[in-house]
Regions:
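Bacterial Sec-dependent N-terminal signal peptides
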Residues: 1-25
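A generic structural signal for short, solvent-exposed coil/turn residues
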Residues: 13-17, 99, 157, 213-215, ...
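Short, surface-exposed loop and linker segments with low hydrophobicity and enrichment for Pro/Ser/Thr
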Residues: 9, 227, 258, 425-426, ...
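Serine/threonine-rich, low-complexity intrinsically disordered segments
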Residues: 6, 13-14, 102, 351, ...
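Extracytoplasmic mature domains of secreted or surface-exposed proteins
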Residues: 21-412
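A generic "functional-site adjacency" signal
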Residues: 6, 17, 27-28, 233, ...
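C-terminal outer-membrane/trafficking sorting elements
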Residues: 414-484
Length: 484
């Protein structure tokens, strides 16, 4: 193991500030070591059980590799070079990715080739990154008979337990047959034509796009977007509910949002958290986010203030692109679509009426955040957008932020301020106090590099001059007990 040792000295310290020394990252802190270096946005993401991540987006290079639209990252953010080894990926951006039960990946996007082989805009990729040619890769999506829109966009993929899946976006035909905004497919890629929530065309003056979808535990679907004319008229707009049997829930009360929906996520039982660029609802002002009850009515208890998002009263160009309830906190990301430098990544209380006192994001992105993904354990928040920095760290387009204190893998952490020696940091000096008798002191970087290895036998504080950073400190006493 490479060792970079520093001289230690013994001093008496009157008082220092407490440090959570056992945490590799503190809650709210950006993980500067997680740095894949994309040259474009991540638009969709699958979090693997082994800690790896599959990212789809509008990137053409990741690090030193020329790869378009789809890549798999290791748990530390490095590229998984075994995935699509030697391949170039798509010829254009990918908008959505989902993992099948057997470990393959469904990918949708604006592409026409994968590894230089002609494909449709929906493909299935094997676990090793190669094209699954057993899947029906020639599905044809279209937008026809519409006044202004000619080009399709596939925005969302939602898996079902039986292997079927939904695709939603900007289209109204699949293989020449009616499919307004959403279609259901069998596992082999053939369309399940029994799923047709409406037999009516999207209204010609509607903006026909689904930007957000959430599948409820009962199997029903909530769809949000810019559409203003689902089911042929203007009553079903911005946010709709599709029953588990595939029928349109026409009893779902329309909240009358004055803008578009860009994110939907669960908010406890029988409620959803909705984000977008709306400013009002039929029940009054709701700035960029609101909570909707199961029947479509507005939850009056959630009501965030405008200054949580911006100090600028000209708020028409602001939008929330991602929102999620995590414990008793609401995480929101977004910014100004006209002035990208006006961005936010905030944590509100559950009622939206104040900033959280239990979780604060330490560094703000320098440009708009357009994507949010939180792992199932609520350990990390992954964000993407137009930013190149988060706080003081250069992190182009993609970053990871800790939502709770993170302890290095393989370390059994103990809060040594309470049960043994104490470790504190102040003014460039790491001090260790409370050692009794003979002990072994080790200080490592988070990558495992030894910075200090020594035997000590002094009751006075041990002082190590170290630059500000994250360190792993281990103290093994004469009885063989180790504090980390």
């Amino acid at each position: 193991m490479k060792q970079t040792l520093v001289k230690i000295s013994f001093i008496t310290v009157a008082s220092v500030f407490s440090l959570s020394s056992y945490a590799q990252l503190k809650a709210g802190e950006v993980d500067a070591s997680y740095k894949p270096v994309f040259d474009g946005n991540v638009l969709s993401m699958v979090l693997e059980p082994d800690g790896k991540n599959v990212c789809a987006g509008s990137f053409y290079n990741v690090g030193d590799r020329k790869i378009c639209g789809l890549i798999r990252l290791k748990a530390n953010g490095d590229e998984d070079e075994s995935f699509n080894k030697g391949g170039k990926g798509f010829d254009s951006y990918a908008t959505a990715v989902a993992r099948t039960s057997d470990g393959k990946y469904l990918v949708a996007g604006h592409f026409t080739t994968y590894n230089e082989k002609a494909v449709g805009s929906l493909v299935r990729i094997n676990a090793d990154g190669t094209l699954d040619e057993t899947f029906k890769n020639d599905i044809k999506f279209e937008i026809v008979n519409h006044k202004n829109i000619k080009e399709i966009e596939l925005q969302q993929i939602v898996m079902l337990p039986n292997g079927q899946f939904y695709v939603a976006g900007c289209f109204n035909r699949v293989n020449g047959k009616l499919a307004p905004l959403i279609a259901r497919f069998n596992a082999d890629g053939t369309r399940d034509e029994s799923f047709l929530p409406t037999d009516k065309e999207i209204h010609l003056k509607s903006s026909p796009n689904v930007d957000a979808i959430w599948k409820a535990p009962d199997g029903s679907l909530y769809l949000g977007g810019s559409f203003g004319g689902y089911d042929g008229g203007f009553k079903q707009k911005r946010l709709i509910h599709i029953n588990a049997d595939g029928t349109l829930d026409r009893s779902f009360h329309q909240p009358q949002l004055d803008g578009f929906v860009k994110s939907i996520s669960p908010f406890g039982e029988d409620k959803i958290l909705v984000g977008g660029d709306f400013l009002t609802t039929e029940s009054g002002d709701r700035f960029l986010t609101c909570v909707i009850n199961k029947d479509g009515s507005l939850d009056e208890s959630y009501n965030p203030r405008q200054n949580f998002f911006t100090e600028n009263h000209e708020a028409e160009s602001l939008a929330v692109f991602g929102s999620k309830l995590v414990g008793d906190n609401v995480i929101i990301v977004g910014g100004d679509v006209v002035t990208p430098g006006n961005a936010f990544f905030h944590v509100l209380t559950k009622d939206g009426k104040d900033f959280s006192s239990t979780l604060k994001i330490e560094g703000q992105p320098n440009k708009i955040v357009s994507f949010l993904k939180i792992d199932d354990s609520e350990k990390y928040a992954y964000i993407s957008g137009f930013f190149t920095k988060v706080g003081d760290y250069v992190l182009p387009y993609f970053a990871r932020v800790a939502l709770r204190d993170i302890v290095p893998d393989g370390i059994n952490a103990t809060n040594i301020n309470k049960v043994g020696p104490s470790v504190r940091y102040n003014n460039g000096m790491l001090t260790v106090n409370g050692i009794e008798g003979n002990a072994e002191l080790s200080v490592y970087s988070t990558k495992g590099t030894a910075i200090t290895l020594c035997n000590v036998s002094n009751a006075l504080p041990i002082a190590l001059p170290l630059p500000k950073g994250i360190y792993i400190v281990q103290i093994k006493n004469a009885n063989g007990k180790t504090y980390t």
